[in-house]
Amino acid sequence: MPCLDEAAALPWVLDRIPPGWRAIVVDNGSTDGSARIAAEHGAYVVHAPVRGFGAACHAGLLAATADVVCFCDCDGSLDPALLPTVAGPVLDGAADLVLGRRRPTTFRAWPPHARLANLQLARLLHRRTGLRLHDLGPMRAARREDLLALALTDRRSGYPLQMVVRAADADWRIRETPVPYAPRTGRSKVTGTWRGTWHAVRDMTAVLNERAGDGRAGTEKAGDGRAGGGRAGTEQAGNATVGSESAGHAAAGDDSAVTAGAR
């Protein structure tokens, strides 16, 4: 779970990690004691000194040892207790990448301007890949070795988008499942400032301008194919009931791992 100054949210987030799962919190230069608090609550702490959401996420991915890894923000907006639901289709072999589709629990959880920006991003993603997704939320699950084979290069705000774009280019089976989205604890590190918003827009634009196959090992997955150069369709997983956002990583024995982060 990528973490930058989330001391206030970490105790609740880590207490919600499913039994038997191992949380990996990647500290990205916190000054509020987040790393110490994470360790006190049983997390394995990794330090990623180079600032950036993608840098923290990728450090967690490299530190993971489980076959299946899950990403989740650690700001309290997403509930790690729901990670088994998100990881389930991957563990069962029914999907290669599962994304948690955020369902706001209150108006304050997801303001209109943020929802509109997410909708526009989904439209641009469809134009680029053919995928029809409702959300590119931070809670997600995939197999570790498959993610490493995508050779993700973005180390800032474009990392989650690049993961989806390159997975689509490799013909992965991508599904969505609904997760509850609550107001975060503390200030957003990305959209909480104009500078952060600008960097996010810049990073994501660069990812969308990538050509298929740019800078990665081409590992295509068997499964859903493409129609007319675009994804034939993304499936909607329908059995989830809850979810949230934060920075960290956890593993269920040798079967699954979770990386959660909120910036």
Model-derived features: where do they sit?
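Acidic helix N-cap motif at the loop->helix transition within catalytic regions
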Residues: A8-W12, D32-H41
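Donor nucleotide-sugar binding loop of glycosyltransferases
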Residues: E6-A9, S30, F53, D79
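Conserved donor nucleotide-binding strand/loop of the catalytic core
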Residues: I24, A35-A63
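A conserved acidic beta->alpha catalytic loop
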Residues: D27-A35, G76
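Short aromatic/hydrophobic "clamp" motif used to bind/position activated sugar donors
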Residues: V69
